[in-house]
Swiss-Prot record:
<protein>
    <recommendedName>
        <fullName>Large ribosomal subunit protein bL36</fullName>
    </recommendedName>
</protein>
<dbReference type="GO" id="GO:0003735">
    <property type="term" value="F:structural constituent of ribosome"/>
</dbReference>
<dbReference type="GO" id="GO:0005840">
    <property type="term" value="C:ribosome"/>
</dbReference>
<dbReference type="GO" id="GO:1990904">
    <property type="term" value="C:ribonucleoprotein complex"/>
</dbReference>
<keyword id="KW-0687">Ribonucleoprotein</keyword>
<dbReference type="InterPro" id="IPR000473">
    <property type="entry name" value="Ribosomal_bL36"/>
</dbReference>
<comment type="similarity">
    <text>Belongs to the bacterial ribosomal protein bL36 family.</text>
</comment>
<dbReference type="Pfam" id="PF00444">
    <property type="entry name" value="Ribosomal_L36"/>
</dbReference>
<dbReference type="InterPro" id="IPR047621">
    <property type="entry name" value="Ribosomal_L36_bact"/>
</dbReference>
<keyword id="KW-0689">Ribosomal protein</keyword>
<dbReference type="GO" id="GO:0006412">
    <property type="term" value="P:translation"/>
</dbReference>
<dbReference type="InterPro" id="IPR035977">
    <property type="entry name" value="Ribosomal_bL36_sp"/>
</dbReference>
Amino acid sequence: MKVRSSVKKISPDDQIVRRRGRIYVINKKRPRNKQRQG
């Protein structure tokens, strides 16, 4: 998981999710696109 100050969609399959006040990017097809805003 990458921790970044600004998260953006890398590919069209990415989903932006808000959990516990943090913003995450998840992608089931490409798990290496996982990001968290930190």
